[in-house]
Amino acid sequence: MSNLTYLQGYPEQLLSQVRTLINEQRLGDVLAKRYPGTHDYATDKALWQYTQDLKNQFLRNAPPINKVMYDNKIHVLKNALGLHTAVSRVQGGKLKAKVEIRVATVFRNAPEPFLRMIVVHELAHLKEKEHNKAFYQLCCHMEPQYHQLEFDTRLWLTQLSLGQNKI
């Protein structure tokens, strides 16, 4: 139980509260009360439209996104929740860049705020490549509750990994 993989780096006092919720088997209930239901973006096409809507709202001048999809290999292979890639190819003597965003399949059945947090995170990489202060400021600009949602997403993933009742 001391190995809370998704919550490493958080203060011990906070981890103690999480352990209490886990021991009392209340973590799933707390999350379900805070984030009832799931989102309607279960297909790659719906995810692409959702991502485009957020991009057009906050990052109009960012490079276009060529592909957005759920990827069932992300979690296992990369130990990540989402990936952004920019692939450069030579096409007719010119260099073309293609931008892709991939979201872990586990978010297909997640509450909408958790999906939003992941998409906002990956969109922020269009402007800021590194996880620095400017990156997190951009995330908070697009989603004011970004840090709370990131923590709650980590709680949700912890709860899923323990096999407790799901949201």
UniProtKB/Swiss-Prot annotation:
Role according to the record: Specifically catalyzes the hydrolysis of UTP to UMP and diphosphate in vitro, albeit at apparently slow rate. Shows no activity towards ATP, GTP, CTP, dTTP and ITP as substrates.
Matching Pfam families: YgjP-like
Reaction equations catalysed: UTP + H2O = UMP + diphosphate + H(+)
Top-tier EC class: hydrolase
Listed InterPro entries: UTP_pyrophosphatase-like (IPR053136), YgjP-like_metallopeptidase (IPR002725)
Protein name: UTP pyrophosphatase
Upper classification of the organism: Bacteria, Pseudomonadati, Pseudomonadota, Gammaproteobacteria, Enterobacterales
Superkingdom assignment: Bacteria
Keywords: Hydrolase, Nucleotide metabolism, Nucleotide-binding
Gene Ontology MF, one: nucleotide binding
EC identifiers of the protein: 3.6.1.-
CDD domains found in the cross-reference section: M48_yhfN_like
Species of the source: Escherichia coli (strain K12)
Gene Ontology terms describing biological process: nucleotide metabolic process
